[in-house]
Amino acid sequence: MEILMTVSKFASFCTMGANASALEKEIGSEQFPVNEHYFGLVNFGNTCYCNSVLQALYFCRPFREKILAYRSQPRRKENLLTCLADLFHSIANQKRKVGVIPPKKFITRLRKENELFDNYMQQDAHEFLNYLLNTIADLLQEERKQDKQNGKLANGTLDSQNNNSTPPSTTWVHEIFQGTLTNETRCLTCETISSKDEDFLDLSVDVEQNTSITHCLRGFSNTETLCSEYKYYCEECRSKQEAHKRMRVKKLPMILALHLKRFKYMEQLQRYTKLSYRVVFPLELRLFNTSGDATNPERLYDLVAVVVHCGSGPNRGHYIAIVKSHDFWLLFDDDIVEKIDAQAIEEFYGLTSEISKNSESGYILFYQSRD
């Protein structure tokens, strides 16, 4: 059995080598971007949800640069962030241009830190993205807190420059991914408008058949009437009143991560099923849909990465990533890396027919601001 496994692994790595060689030839030595590396990631048992998100994040350049800069700092106790930094550093410093890397240390750490991922079952890529970004932000905040405490112990006082800098809750994760929504409620009796801000690292949007991501975002901020048992308690009127409620974007992030809500619970089936609806996502996205006091009311975004779900349900199927690197597109399917045409992205919009049919459809979109 062991001999068979060894032969199987050897054959697999030979195939990877052939794929890598073909990719290098297809791109061409003259066109190959300087200091760029395209490495597939080994699947450690249904870890495609993780591999696809990591590849997408690696090609979000601001995020990659921050992770690599973090890796160059003095070594800290091992955690999920240090493991991610080691993985990105390993990819960025390979002698070869293309190949395969096993993210074993990262996966081991992930399974150790969160029991949700401590198994060999398929997991949700969006849940993993959310967990990863929030964990990194928490670790950075804790490190900042520790550094300030150490500074106080060493010097007897905190560095005033540090003390007056960015708020303690703000990290480079927030600087890259965080946007702000304003929840506006207008009382229909006294016309008083109350608003509440809410920060986000990604936006989850409902999907409909034969629409576009622009349409989904527009629906996200539609006005809702609060009436009957859902009336709004107005502080001015001091009673429950009918009201209009809507969500608007107050601050747009540097990188906008959009999660398409493709998994819906069906009462008649007593389970979640996939909405394979066709949702067009353009290579360029201009956002106007903002609040009156928006800090950046208009912003142009470029699509840089897409996490794609392949299959018919949330707990079965497969995840791949398509990313933009310089002027061309690549498809990462675990250890396989292929160059694709920009037109091929249309294949990942979804289907115009059955909702639960097998499909390869965009699940998480990463748009990077031009400014």
Swiss-Prot record:
One Gene Ontology term from the biological process aspect of the record: proteolysis
Gene from which this protein is expressed: usp12a
Pfam families hit by this protein: UCH
Domain USP: 39-370
CDD domains assigned to the protein according to its UniProt record, in alphabetical order: Peptidase_C19G
InterPro entries recorded: Papain-like_cys_pep_sf (IPR038765), Peptidase_C19 (IPR050164), Peptidase_C19_UCH (IPR001394), USP_CS (IPR018200), USP_dom (IPR028889)
Chain sites annotated for binding Zn(2+): C187, C190, C234, C237
Keywords assigned: Hydrolase, Metal-binding, Protease, Thiol protease, Ubl conjugation pathway, Zinc
Lineage: superkingdom: Eukaryota
Span list, region Disordered: 148-169
GO cellular component: cytoplasm; cytosol; nucleus; plasma membrane
Biased amino acid composition, Polar residues: 157-169
UniProt family annotation: Belongs to the peptidase C19 family. USP12/USP46 subfamily.
EC top class, as a word: hydrolase
Name assigned to this protein: Ubiquitin carboxyl-terminal hydrolase 12A
Gene3D superfamilies given in the database record: Cysteine proteinases
EC number in record: 3.4.19.12
Assembly, per entry: Interacts with WDR48.
Active site, per annotation: C48, H318
Annotated catalysed reactions: Thiol-dependent hydrolysis of ester, thioester, amide, peptide and isopeptide bonds formed by the C-terminal Gly of ubiquitin (a 76-residue protein attached to proteins as an intracellular targeting signal)
GO molecular function annotation: cysteine-type deubiquitinase activity; cysteine-type endopeptidase activity; metal ion binding
